[in-house]
Amino acid sequence: AAIQEADTVIGYVTYIRLVADLLDGKEIIRKSMTEELDRAVEALSRAREGKKVALISSGDAGVYGMAGPTFEVLLQAGWTPPAITLETDEAGHEQRIVGDGIEVEIIPGASALNSCAALVGAPLTHDFCSISLSDLLTPWPTIARRLDAAAQADFVVALYNPKSGRRTRQIVEAQQLFLRHRSPTTPVAIVKSAYRRRQHIEFTTLDRMAEADIGMLSTVLIGNSNTFMQHGLMITPRGYANKYDVTGDRGVKGGERSGRSLSSGLNGWLQSLHADHAAGMSVADLAAQYRLPVDYIQASLDAPLPEPEVSKSRRKTPAASGSPEGNA
């Protein structure tokens, strides 16, 4: 609807082509891959002329899309939202600020990680993150630190912009960083052009990931230590097997309680931490065991232990005479 209502449509050449059937009678402004700021400037210029402008992205505009660059350009140009807002000056007095009349609406879409996950099974059922391998705007050491941290923390990871004609080594570097923390057989799914005409899906493993057919239109999903492949599906368990007998009567496992934190949750872990330390384990050894910072372990030991959870039970009212319970 937003594109159909627009007077002007601005976007990357490929994205314009994807919505060609919606563009009859509209002003179309095509820009190249590296002209994101120019697109935002053009959108502001046309909006100031009184036109409705659709600035299109693939996936979700707020995930590696045009939402961020657009707001940066608008704010640098002195734009404020059209609604009357209140701000407080240095003296504590409220000031009324009226915007310049240009309304901006971010319309959410399905990001590549959502679309790709739906095509390959359920890989994002537990904690995950996304990392772009594009170093056009981000220094490589920053990207590498994020990759290493995500790999060590056992996130399922969606890699955006994994490879291009010029950027071919980044995916290899990412693989090497992940192999420092993950099994070589960790499941990997590579989805190219999700839900488009040339859609292609390939399943592989972490040790062979860099050999796969990967390009700019690909999204790479790397599983965590519990992710598995079965019947052509990539699945990351949510963790129910930690608490429940998922193969038998679905009952709660010994030592666990339904609706309460795991025995290895925060309170249980703190109890174990204190017990291990009292038994002679050093702070450094505990930090190494849990792969957590030494100062965090020390702070956890310095803090008072939380009160243990106590199960609350209500006194059962005696059954009235003549009831089934009373006759039992």
Predicted regions and their residues:
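A contiguous loop/helix-start segment that scaffolds small-molecule binding in enzyme catalytic cores
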Residues: 152-265, 271, 312-318, 324-326
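Helix-turn-helix DNA-binding elements, focusing on the entry/boundary residues of the two helices
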Residues: 283
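Class I S-adenosyl-L-methionine
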Residues: 1-104, 210, 250-260, 267-272, ...
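Short, solvent-exposed alpha-helical "recognition" segments
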Residues: 295-313
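Class I SAM-dependent methyltransferase SAM-binding "motif I" and its flanking Rossmann-like core
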Residues: 65-156
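Short alpha-helical "recognition helix" segments of helix-turn-helix
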Residues: 286-287
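Short amphipathic helical patch at the helix-1/turn junction of helix-turn-helix
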Residues: 276-278
